[in-house]
Amino acid sequence: YVILLIFVLLFHLTVTYSLLLKLFANLNPLIFFRKMRNVALFAFSTSSSAATIPVTLKTVTDDLGVKKDVSSFVVPVGATINMDGTAIMQGLATMFIASTVGVDLTFAQYAQIVFLAIITSIGTAAVPSAGTVTLALILGSVGLPLDAIGLILAVDRILDMVRTSVNVCGDAAVSCIVAKSENELDEQTFNNR
């Protein structure tokens, strides 16, 4: 579970965000990730999207060239509702627990897990390990034992750090894409090495 989740989160971070930046904003993902390095490390150490907002805002505005009008709206909203790392964790954790306790899930249950993971991740607080709390809702909805959440809690601290880094980089990527679409991106600042 741990290795798979880290792989999927890193894949989402590097591949999905790179494609979004290239396709929707025609921006170099390597420059983006290099400039977001310190923000990702700060998010990793705090495990809180909310605590990372000031650092993210400064980097998005000063280093990535997003105008303050866009960044001051997109980053806080993203820190509140953009929890894609959490949605990935909840889906994989539910499937891991089902497999561990010997429950075969139906296609309808898989669809329900995906739907609930997305919805609950939007409502998850931007504080450490909040996604694990909402995982109980998903487990209960597909009839899995809630006490199995202990399997996840044992390793969740490190995984939460990775999830938060993914979430925060997503906030910054969306800020760049929105800024580019609104002509509020200073590409010279973005491309400045």
Q: What residue ranges belong to the model's regions?
A:
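Helix-loop-helix junctions within the multi-pass membrane cores of secondary transporters/permeases
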Residues: 38-121, 175, 187-193
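Transmembrane helical segments that form the transport core of multi-pass membrane transport proteins
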Residues: 2-3, 23, 28-29
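Transmembrane alpha-helical segments and their short flanking loops
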Residues: 91-193
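Loop-to-transmembrane-helix entry motif
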Residues: 1-6, 36-40, 77-84, 158, ...
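Entry/N-cap segments of selected transmembrane alpha helices
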Residues: 1-17
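Flexible, glycine/charged-enriched surface loops at secondary-structure junctions
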Residues: 29, 66, 71, 165, ...
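Hydrophobic alpha-helical transmembrane bundles that constitute the permease/transmembrane domains
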Residues: 10-14, 81-88, 165-168
